[in-house]
Amino acid sequence: MTYSIVARDKKTGEFGVAVQSHYFQVSPAVPWALAGVGAVATQSHVNLSYGSLGLELLQAGYTAEQALKALTSGDPRAEVRQCAIVDAAGKVAAHTGSKCIPAAGHTLGDGFSCQANLMEKDTVWEAMADAFTTTDAPLAERMMAALEAAEAEGGDLRGKQSAAMVVVAGVGTGRPWNDRIIDLRVEDAAEPLPELRRLLRIKRAYMTAGDADHLEETGDLAGAIAQLQQALSIAPEMIELRFMTGCTMAVAGDVDGGSVLIAEAIRKNGRWRDMLHRLVTVDLLRADVVSAIEARLAAVSQRI
């Protein structure tokens, strides 16, 4: 039915789960993660309590192995369940019930577990592990590579439908809205993995752009512009990033360069021009900067 990976990143301490299934809206069912605690994947005739209870057990001090044993020993239908857990120490444990539909199995690695059931081939979970361990990238991209490797081996016997990815911080801050670093989901799609890959790329772009906010607040406009330009290079199709970069460049004194980007955004959607003036009303842009931008935009229009 499903293939997934749970993992802890040694360098950052982040925990993650990524999954793909021929099942509508897999995201609320399979991936569970809590900052500073660990991650759980529960699948194959899903017992949703494995997710929340598994995290509670980890939070109470259980190891991954102890938590998994507690879950399965109290489940009269453990033979149809598949579950994997990674704890705060990076220890992993997995269970593939004897009545999971074949091909079904799992493999454990250093800080991760790959598991699958109802696969076309029994090579899926090993291929996932190999892709995860040989990809040099952040945790999310390594998990993405694992999912793509599973699909390359034939994936779910029934086909493809939904996918999801969750990454949380290695240390909890008590602020869940900050601790949940990545939370992406493709609920129903003909090609869920390419769409998940696209969403991850856009998420990275906006995370990079987000770093520019702090730099701008501290007066480092050059640093902010560099971050925004990097974000734009990751997702050049995102009009908002083009507009944001252009405005920041104009504020920093490069009105000509900034106006080029703003003009490109306006050509895509003319309402971005109105946005310039609305930003002035809430003190996010100075009126003189907008006047200078408008002068450049008028000059560009005359040349066109």
Summary of predicted features, one role per range:
Residues M1-M207, E216-T218, I239:
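N-terminal nucleophile
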Residues A231, E264-A265:
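Canonical positions in the second alpha-helix
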Residues P236, G270-R271:
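Short coil turns that delineate tetratricopeptide repeat
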Residues M244, R278-L279:
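Canonical tetratricopeptide repeat
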